[in-house]
């Protein structure tokens, strides 16, 4: 039972006092016990005459006294800094930034982490685009891939701000110095080695009753012929097929690409050049103040799908996203006035193709295409166009700047070829050590 301090009755008012929570807290804290490890409990009496006349100051002063004693006790217990690991400190800084962005987007972040495979990145990217850019429409991309890419670029910015140095490319993209348009020469695709691709005609046979066969007859100038077994098939001939120079003499069996190949292939080299030219001109229209030479020589490419993102291990097959030129829809509706007044419309009209990045090893179409692929190879539904890849970059940096009030580089690296990017026929699984001391038990 608490004792009433002496001379406390002299300060009581004759009016009835309303017992608020603040007053009750003062009465309970008349006697403060401070217990520290290794010390005995000490009781300190505080006279009302020694206190400030403001009850708020009295409560604040008592709280500060308790906090100071607890900090002194903790300093005696652990003389070393609790966050001596820079990785842990960086992860906590990154998590604080994630929490700030989630609160700005009215998004629940409890239980999330800053791991690259956490779903919080995709949620932040998708929520921001849906709230701030509801009018935005994708071009050949899937919403899952686009939202994930916005989250990847956002993760790259947050990792950079927190001082983290991941062993992978957090943005899942590279800046590629392509070299497709040399001066005074006819433009022609170059593979990821930086060498001119080789024209190698290819013929594909499809089942007439399959979806791929029907699409080939309707859209790709396929013809029905009899194969060497006497069966009717839809034949697609690609006379302008371009392959990596390593695949020039490769027969396609038992693997679709030769050892050391980058696995880049275009069924129509002219369409690939048109798509690359379009993406360059469109990027220059989006960034009118950018360095013209750098915008001409370099492009932003998606290199990691869901199969090999946030991993330093090789996968079976192709090691970066497959690039395919797609024909743009609606370019016939672009008028001459629009072409003369808008550089982006001029790019669409002049080169009506864009590059689309799909899974590193997409599932083969039924009917014989890619029959050298194994059914056990890892695959995903990644699909992202070059235009939407650029918009993902823009939205990610825009979101970070709007919430944090400052900009931060994404550190998108420049692509440089090395043998780790070559097509892999077999991948050795890493060893997971076993604790047992007897391998024959």
Swiss-Prot record:
Sequence ranges of Acidic residues compositional bias: 24-33, 67-79
InterPro entries associated with the record: Ad_DBP_C_sf, ADBP_zn-bd_sf, Adenovirus_DNA-bd_a, Adenovirus_DNA-bd_N_sf, Adenovirus_DNA-bd_zn-bd, ADV_DNB2
Keyword list, A-Z: DNA replication, DNA-binding, Early protein, Host nucleus, Host-virus interaction, Metal-binding, Phosphoprotein, Viral DNA replication, Zinc
Segments of skewed composition (Basic residues): 1-18
Residue numbers binding Zn(2+) 1: 191, 193, 244, 262
Annotated positions binding Zn(2+) 2: 305, 307, 359, 380
Main location: host cell
Pfam families documented for this protein: Viral_DNA_bi, Viral_DNA_Zn_bi
GO molecular function term, any single one: DNA binding
Gene Ontology cellular-component annotations: host cell nucleus; viral capsid
Region (Flexible loop): 204-236
Subcellular location: Host nucleus
HAMAP family found in the cross-reference section: ADV_DNB2 (MF_04054)
Function summary: Plays a role in the elongation phase of viral strand displacement replication by unwinding the template in an ATP-independent fashion, employing its capacity to form multimers. Also enhances the rate of initiation. Released from template upon second strand synthesis. Assembles in complex with viral pTP, viral pol, host NFIA and host POU2F1/OCT1 on viral origin of replication. Covers the whole ssDNA genome during synthesis. The complementary strand synthesis induces its relese from DNA template. May inhibit cellular transcription mediated by the interaction between host SRCAP and CBP.
Protein name (database record): DNA-binding protein
Source species of the chain: Fowl adenovirus A serotype 1 (strain CELO / Phelps) (FAdV-1)
């Amino acid at each position: 039972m608490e004792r009433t301090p002496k001379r406390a009755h002299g300060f009581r008012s004759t009016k009835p006092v309303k017992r608020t929570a603040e007053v009750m807290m003062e009465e309970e804290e008349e006697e403060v016990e401070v217990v520290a490890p290794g010390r005995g409990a000490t009781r300190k009496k505080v006279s009302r005459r020694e206190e400030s006349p403001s009850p708020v100051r009295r409560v604040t002063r008592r709280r500060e006294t308790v906090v100071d004693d607890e900090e002194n006790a903790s300093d005696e217990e652990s003389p070393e800094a609790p966050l001596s690991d820079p990785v842990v400190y960086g992860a906590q800084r990154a998590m604080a930034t994630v929490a700030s962005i989630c609160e700005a987007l009215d998004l629940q972040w409890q239980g999330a982490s800053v791991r690259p495979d956490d779903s919080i990145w995709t949620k932040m990217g998708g929520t921001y685009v849906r709230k701030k850019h509801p009018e935005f429409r994708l071009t050949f991309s899937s919403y899952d891939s686009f939202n994930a890419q916005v989250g990847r670029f956002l993760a790259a910015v947050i990792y950079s701000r927190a001082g983290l140095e991941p062993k992978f490319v957090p943005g899942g993209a590279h800046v590629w110095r392509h070299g497709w348009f040399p001066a005074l020469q006819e433009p022609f695709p170059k593979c990821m080695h930086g060498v001119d691709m080789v024209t190698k005609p290819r013929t594909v046979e499809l089942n007439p009753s399959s979806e791929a066969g029907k699409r080939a007859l309707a859209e790709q100038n396929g013809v029905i012929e009899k194969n060497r077994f006497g069966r009717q098939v839809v034949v697609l001939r690609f006379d302008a097929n371009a392959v990596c120079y390593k695949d020039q003499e490769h027969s396609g069996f038992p693997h679709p690409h030769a050892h050391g190949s980058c696995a880049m292939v275009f069924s129509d080299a002219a369409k690939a050049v048109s798509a690359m030219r379009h993406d360059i001109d469109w990027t220059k229209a989006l960034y009118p103040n950018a360095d013209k030479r750098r915008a001409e020589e370099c492009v932003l490419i998606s290199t990691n799908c869901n199969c090999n993102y946030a991993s330093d291990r090789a996968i079976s097959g192709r090691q970066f996203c497959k690039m395919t030129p797609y024909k743009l829809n609606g370019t016939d509706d672009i008028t001459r006035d629009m072409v003369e007044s808008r550089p982006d419309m001029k790019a669409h009209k002049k080169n009506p193709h864009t590059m689309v990045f799909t899974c590193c090893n997409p599932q083969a179409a039924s009917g014989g295409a890619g029959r050298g692929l194994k059914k056990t190879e890892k695959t995903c539904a990644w699909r992202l166009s070059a235009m939407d890849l650029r918009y993902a970059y823009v939205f990610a940096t825009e979101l970070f700047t709007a919430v944090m009030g400052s900009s931060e580089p994404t550190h998108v690296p420049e692509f440089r070829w090395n043998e780790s990017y070559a097509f892999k026929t077999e991948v050795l699984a890493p060893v997971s050590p076993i604790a047992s001391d007897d391998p024959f038990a």
